[in-house]
């Protein structure tokens, strides 16, 4: 990717991330992204064009909750981090999974805007989840300290795992004594895996806000909202109302390159914006 095209790509991404809005733009806000990066490891890091696009995507957010890190080795993660601006740090969860194909959750964050207070992998004593949710408790410069819960739901057991998520939320609200919780990730909460009409009963509106409801979050020809942000009602007080899906196959022109959009990922990144203080 030449510098001119990369610059254009980043400008277009900025337009996607900073939509016109009637909200007061002088208030300090943060942008949080969730991204199933699809089988991240040595092979993906060996494709320079893929890596440059991923770096461009990730660099537009303040926190990025990543799913599907498959590499046994840590060096692909470290090499990717070295390509990001120095302000970014990360935490990474344990390798999770019942089979030999295990995954890690990876949360990248702007160290100038956030402090990691605590991190934890949910103690799944009943073995409900294929990959136990990974939680990070963040402190901001304002009143909005929050727990981020990163999760990747198993497609073949989506309903059982999704139904267990409110218990995970309650666990961390009690453990860290903070009602502000953001649950995000690849829920596989649509299509043949899950009846998405069940979400409103699992996450009732008096306790939660479901930000993504009918947006297409998959690169495939089918239209499904697999990826989600679900936040507690307390956290919704900080939500600006701005959110979106980064359809990188439309933002970026792939015609002159050897890679296909599906080699970047089979999912689009999703994002939501929050105030750091009550506004």
Positions of PLM-derived features:
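N-terminal, active-site-proximal structural segment of metallo-dependent hydrolase catalytic domains
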Residues: 2-8, 12, 16-87, 97-105, ...
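Loop/turn elements at helix/coil->beta-strand transitions in domains of secreted/extracellular proteins
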Residues: 27-31, 59-63, 85-89, 112-115, ...
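Active-site-proximal beta-strand elements of phosphoester/diester hydrolases
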Residues: 29-39, 117-122, 135-137, 145-155
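Conserved hydrophobic/aromatic beta-strand scaffold that supports enzyme active sites
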Residues: 34, 63, 105-107, 133-137, ...
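Second-shell loop/turn segments in exported
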Residues: 37-45, 54, 62-70, 92-96, ...
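Extracytoplasmic/secreted proteins, especially bacterial periplasmic and envelope-associated proteins
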Residues: 49-60, 75-79, 83, 103, ...
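Metal-dependent phosphoester-hydrolase catalytic domains
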Residues: 72, 159, 171-179, 189-279
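Structured beta-strand-rich core segments of catalytic domains in phosphoester-bond hydrolases
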Residues: 75-144
């Amino acid at each position: 990717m030449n510098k001119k095209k990369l610059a254009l790509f980043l400008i277009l991404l900025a337009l996607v991330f900073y939509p016109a809005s009637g909200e007061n733009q002088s208030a300090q806000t943060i942008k949080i992204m969730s991204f199933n990066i699809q089988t991240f490891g040595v092979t993906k890091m060996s494709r320079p064009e893929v890596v440059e696009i991923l770096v461009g995507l990730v660099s537009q957010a303040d926190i990025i909750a990543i799913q599907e890190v498959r590499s046994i080795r840590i060096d692909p993660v470290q090499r990717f981090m070295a390509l990001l601006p120095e302000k970014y740090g990360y935490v990474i969860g344990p390798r999770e999974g019942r089979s030999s194909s295990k995954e890690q959750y990876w949360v990248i964050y702007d160290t100038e805007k956030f402090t990691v207070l605590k991190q934890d992998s949910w103690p799944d004593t009943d073995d409900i989840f294929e990959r136990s949710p990974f939680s990070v408790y963040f402190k901001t410069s304002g009143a909005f300290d929050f727990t981020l819960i990163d999760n990747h739901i198993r497609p073949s057991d989506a309903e059982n795992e999704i139904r267990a998520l409110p218990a995970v939320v309650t666990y961390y609200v009690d453990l860290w004594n903070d009602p502000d919780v953001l649950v995000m990730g690849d829920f596989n909460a649509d299509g043949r895996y899950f009846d998405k009409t069940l979400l409103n009963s699992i996450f009732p509106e008096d306790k939660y806000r479901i930000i993504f409801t009918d947006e297409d979050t998959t690169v495939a020809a089918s239209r499904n909202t697999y990826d989600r942000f679900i936040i507690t009602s307390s956290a919704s007080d900080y939500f600006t109302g701005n959110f979106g899906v980064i359809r990188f196959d439309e933002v970026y022109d792939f015609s002159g390159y050897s890679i296909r959009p599906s080699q970047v990922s089979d999912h689009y990144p999703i994002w939501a914006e929050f105030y750091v203080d009550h506004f």
